[in-house]
Regions:
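Small-residue-centered hinge/linker elements
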Residues: 1-124, 132-221
Length: 221
């Protein structure tokens, strides 16, 4: 191979390397520009703003047990509901409910907040019960203007229950003794290692009846 041929090959390789470096540089510049564009768009159109650019109906799915740490809770549920009420393009709200109930407190807070929001708007809000809308699930559903349910849906179950397990007899059989130091007559009211006293039973029954009566009163209003 002549020196000229070798020189041409070397020059060709050098040019290829330069082209590769230019391509990599351009790719990086393009990538940075793309990121800047995305960042700018996210600032000018934040996700918390009106996502929909035309009139629409918001569908809020409430599925599961109602509890402070459950899938239906005051924090996440009311955040979605408030966004729908505050969105001028949202004309109707549908609560898609599939819940056996849960916390009376969480249900009551959601129910009350929806009633407050309804006073300041002319939006229509409907509850659609799928498989189950019982107890607290029905409580929340009752905040709507209308409730829709299938003939096979489980709806209602207006009531209150307070549950507690008692391991005292089991521990006695195992020779295990529970020792607790407490102050206040009701501090051990639901202690799983103590029997409920008649006074405690009366107190809990009155509490359940009070919550139940409030539940019924809200549903009648």
């Amino acid at each position: 191979m002549s020196d000229d041929s070798l020189a041409k090959i070397v020059d060709s390789l050098v040019e290829e390397r330069k082209s590769e470096r230019k391509f990599k540089l351009l790719s990086r510049v393009f990538f940075v520009i793309l990121l800047l564009i995305i960042f700018y768009l996210s600032l000018s159109n934040p996700m918390d703003d009106n996502i929909y650019q035309s009139e629409h109906t918001a569908v809020i799915k409430l599925d599961g047990v109602i509890a402070s740490n459950g899938t239906i809770n005051t924090e996440t549920t009311l955040e979605l509901i408030r966004k729908a009420f505050n969105n001028d393009l949202c004309k109707n709200i549908i609560l898609k409910i599939n819940s056996p109930g849960g916390s009376a407190t969480q249900s009551k807070i959601i129910y009350d907040e929806i009633l407050v929001l309804k006073k300041n708007t002319n939006k229509n809000i409907f509850s659609v019960i799928e498989d189950v809308g019982a107890s607290g699930g029905y409580y929340i559903a009752a905040s709507a203007d209308k409730i829709f349910a299938s003939n096979s849906s489980i709806v209602g179950s207006i009531g209150v229950r307070i549950d507690s397990l008692n391991f005292k007899s089991l521990f006695n059989k195992l020779g295990i003794k529970s020792q607790t130091i407490s102050s206040g007559k009701d501090k051990l009211i639901l202690d799983p290692f103590q029997d409920l006293t008649e006074e405690h039973k009366t107190h809990l029954t009155q509490l359940a009846n009070s919550i139940h009566n409030e539940f019924i009163s809200d549903l009648k209003s």
